[in-house]
Amino acid sequence: MKKLLAMMLTVILALTALMGCGGSNDSTTKATEKDQSSASQGTQGTEEATQSNPGEYTLPLTEEKQELTVWLAYSGSVVTDLNEIEGVKKMEELTNVHINWIPIEQQQISDKMGILLTSGSYPDIIDTNVLPGGIDKNIEDGVIRPDHDKLIKTYMPNYMKYLEENETARKQATADDGTLKIVRILVGEDYNVKAEGVYQGVAYRKDLLESLGLEEPKTIEGWHDALVKAKESGIENPFMINTTGGSFLSLAWGVTTMSQTYLQMGENGKVLGAALQDGFGQYLETMRKWYAEGLIDPNFTSFNFYLDTPNSVENNKQLLYTHILSAFTGNNYATYHMVNNQDEFLQPIVAPAADGGETYMDYSPLEGKDQMFITTSCKNPELAAKWLDFFFTKEGELLNWYGIEGTTYTMDADGIPQFTDMVLNDPNHTPPATILEKYALGWGNCWIGKHNTVASEKVATAAAGGMNQQAAAVEIWTSGVKNIGLPSGYTLTEEESDKVSTKQTAVQTLIEEYMVNYIIGNDDTSFEDFKTKLVQFGYQEIIDTYQAAIDRFNNR
């Protein structure tokens, strides 16, 4: 089990090289500024480090060598000193800014961030996907400088250009009051901003379905018949649902059952309670019927999709899975030596529409995630802003993700960077990502500046022998015609969070207990009575609160 867990963690970390980590919502409170002592070393006055025309972006950023201290998540294992990375050396040469790095293992971010915030002395720049209290609380507490809006608009023209070109990214980077309070890590391909896709969903064992002489079903009824045939062939419990009774298959009825909020978007920007929709009841009725027929594994409430799926795949225990990560689709369980079953092939699917109409997906596009910010300890905030902006330049993006031109990448005839054979075809079979850790900062599972998904996909494809099943899965799961996912980047105020947090916990518990007990036949409460109880527990108030937050987001 320990070996399996270690392998699972390794693969999931590899997955983050493609998908990254999302940030959390931030509460809105009054901002004040507090003086803090400097944590930077070797910095000089503001005027000496900035150009006479701040609207222009030129290199080097400063005539005289300057230093900044940067705290960030970094989980690479090849280098111990980030200044030994070849791309980082080149960045220093171009910017004339030396960085005193404070790298933190991703698993330690929460603990280390808590300690840092209470210390009262901060590095010049912090890059993190964990921020206790949210942005406004840390402005009020004197951690984050309150003048980011001016700094960004004056000294970060390359970042601003991306925001001006992408409306969603601009909204996700902007607070409800219309200001830019921090710098967002932007997601995209080479030189553009574009959201990532859906990285988890329904998948079936293609090899087992073919052994039954069946083609992929295109309807819910077809899947029912396939599960029946699988059971008759010896697969005792062919469908595995989530521990809560939910499933991405519920999208067939146009509802989400795999959400902590159990909220979704309807027509014209309206927030809906998923558990109040007719489709929710139809999903539960179908699952109750399938469970009674022995098609759903009775141990679903204790099944761990991370740890238990390999054993299920190894021993052909299931035909259909409600929840698979893109990293484990195709025959990747075998590729990663997590199973010995070389025939296994997990084929992703979009849940077929139960009414025969258009398909659904639960997708929250994220172009601007996590946060980078300049702290109140920074004595040279203008230089810090310019240095952050370098990562949004063409040179910065190439150095951060492709490394050194002529060594780890070349430019093709269309001006597109392509990794060299040194990276993709190492004679010692060293993984491309491992090679790149010596040359490009981004390959230490480090998100700073812009997260280039194309570079990640190229490496993942090479590592998979030229066939990127993971990317193919993402494309399939993001192909639903209608999207019911809430937008990314909306924020609840501190007052709103306090008002609904307890209600949300109670509603979530009520929904999940009802789903499980109704499916297994232990609860005969009608769906209408269940909905009435949800409203009594404050479900509508939660819906209204999120509606207000999303309305503010849409009006940014």
Model-derived regions, located:
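Helix-loop-helix "hinge/cap" segment bordering the ligand-binding cleft or interdomain interface
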Residues: 177-179, 184-248, 265-314, 321, ...
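Loop/turn elements at helix/coil->beta-strand transitions in domains of secreted/extracellular proteins
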Residues: 64-68, 95-100, 119-124, 141-145, ...
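C-terminal motif of bacterial Sec signal peptides marking the signal peptidase cleavage site
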Residues: 16-20
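Conserved N-terminal structural module of periplasmic/extracytoplasmic solute-binding proteins
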Residues: 21-216, 220-222, 253, 262-263, ...
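Carboxylate/His-rich catalytic cores and anion/metal-binding grooves
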Residues: 144-172, 227-230, 234-264, 268, ...
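Conserved small-residue motifs centered on glycine
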Residues: 395-517, 522
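Positively charged n-region of N-terminal signal peptides that target proteins for export
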Residues: 1-4
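Glycine-rich, aromatic-lined ligand/substrate-binding cores of catalytic
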Residues: 222, 289-291, 309-332, 338-342, ...
